[in-house]
Amino acid sequence: MTHSITRRQFLKASGLAAVGTCAAGLLSSCGGSSSAGSSAASGTASAGGSSYTILYDSQPSTLNYLTTASDLEMQVGANCVDTLVEYDNKGVMKEGLATNWDWDVDTLTWTFHLRDENWVDCNGEVVAPVTAQDFVDALKYVLTPDYASSNVDLVTSYIAGADDYYNYYVYLANANGGIVDDDGTTYTVDASGVVTVAGPDGTTTYAPVDFENVGVHAVDEHTLTYTLTYDFPGFLSLLCYLPYEPAYGPLLEEVGDQFATSAETTYSCGAYYLAEYESLETWIMKKNPENYDADNVFIETVSRIYNAEASVNGPEMIKRGEIDEATIGSDILDSWLADDTTKDMVSMDRPNTNYTYFYMFNFCPLPHNFSNATVDGLDAEYEPENWAKAINSTNFRKAFLYGINNAVTLAVKAPEGYENYKLNTVTPPSFCANSEGVDYLQCGDLANITEFFDEAKAKEYRDAAVEELTAAGATFPIKVQLPYNPSSVDWDKQCQVLKQQLESVLNDGFNFIDIIITAGPSDGFLSTVRRNGKFCFLLCNWGADYSDPQTESDPFYQAEGDRGSRYAFLRTGVEDGYITGETADAVLNYMNAIEEATAITEDIDARYDAFANAEASLINNALVVPMGMSVPKYLATRLNYWEGQYASTGFSNKRLKGIHVLDHYVSMAEYEANRDAR
């Protein structure tokens, strides 16, 4: 029997209400409530002019752009701090804080020459000039283990000496903390600072490493150099991302881990400065008149107002002209398009081609202690031991890979044209090409990957999994916890559609799985759910940080004993012993393949083929289930996003410089005209 879901059916199935939870934060404003904050809180839209007001419903856990990697939290880094290079609205790289740069292949060194620029505080007052040393101090902060930067791998992988420096201080912290790893590895330090690491494979000593050995140096106030570990082709694209931004060194030294926990502890050198942050109230950025490119900053004040029910209240406030932008969810989209008073207020966000979505299985369902973090794993009600048996079965995972019809879940957010967003790979098309101009998706084994959805094959894998798991002592139905973040528009509805569609396939004739949808917290979702192992199956996303396929391995790769990016803990399950046999082999083969691909630095075609083969093995072994590209949100907005910066990697698309606030909400016809005119 063939099961399918019509557009009408899946919309009817997606009626779950989103209820957010709030947590009080520690972030504060600069000097108390300002007039801008009061105006924003009252909800007055610009009606064309120099202010931009929007709601937000998820509390940032930090504003520290040197340590965060979350979408919301990088707003300060994107808009309040300038980068060495930036992009125009067509995706062409141009000057930023650096006016020119050159590459010395013999020494593997990039040299950047900086323009005059100033740091300003939360009142917009000049603090000090931006110097090359600010880039050096910021990178040292990123490489300090105590600050737990989420982006440290983007430095240790490419900057000469960074890996040795970082590892030494990790081992030193372990020694000072008396850490003993699960395999019995111990860390000790002598009076001279030499760290001894004693493990099952032997003993190694590590002498102290001076930061001078790291390949970042301030030659003078306006000259900065980076020395790389190899001729990395994507380095310039990496500079438009958080760990390579500057920070005022004396402030970092003064406040340490309190950097960017408030407007007062955040200095800016970008298009805007952070003027105010009141936890669960307002978030205000103001135009920075000291910025070298201030003439191209057209929005004077950016106000974000906290509203736990932004997805519901935002559209109503748009109708009253109280805010400048709101997301129009799928539950109201049809009615807005049918209403003469609102149909011309609906357009879309600019497509973000560097974000892709995929489903991850949790390979760490049981508690695990890393050296610097603890993963709690699944709650008992979701039967973690039973889940551990299930995910160890390739047949079980392939039943999901072939049983999921991504078209119906994508159609929740893209009622029309959803086929254009489907992916059978993790990496999106047109991401990069080899020296012959061949798209990366046509390199190596990725060229052989096609559509997976096939109900007959899914049931074959299900039947094989039932036989295999019954012999292993598993019980049915397998409980599958599927969480979502209630602050993400339509995620709940996508979960409902996925449950209905997948269960209709895999439970046809046998009670195979029980997908249990759970609402996670609106605030701290990643830390509470994904990074804590509180899921069985989870929709995850990844945005490329730079233009090289290695970036697409970051969610999955784990070095031995490391917690990695805390997506699925693939290697952790193997190291803990409940992932065995062919699944363990597939995991370790992938890790080895990534390490081998990373080591290829002189032949770009061989490098791309190697990464393509690794990604194909990840997918073909159903260690990940590809879903699709980021679907542009339907919006009511007064911004012409086609004026803004654009790049297929990094955070350029989040920058507001160059964008005007219009005196009307953009219609779809105007959106398309703006797109064509860019």
List each model region and its residues.
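Extracytoplasmic/peripheral linker and loop segments enriched in polar/acidic and small residues
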Residues: F10, K389-N392, F396-K398, Y402, ...
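N-terminal lobe/hinge region of extracytoplasmic solute-binding protein
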Residues: L55-V105, Y267
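Append "and occasionally in soluble cytosolic enzymes with long acidic Gly/Pro-rich linkers
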Residues: K94, K286, W387-L506, N613, ...
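Ligand/substrate-recognition segments at binding pockets and active sites
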Residues: C122, S279, I305, E451-A456, ...
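Alpha-helical secondary-structure segments
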Residues: A132-D137, E221-T227, A271, E300-T301, ...
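Gly/Pro-rich hinge or "lid" segments in bacterial periplasmic/extracellular proteins
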Residues: D181-N213, E221-H222, T227-S303, S311, ...
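Extracellular/periplasmic solute-recognition and catalytic clefts
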Residues: A275-K286, S303-D376, V412-K413
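Long beta-strand-rich cores associated with HINT superfamily self-processing modules
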Residues: A636-R678
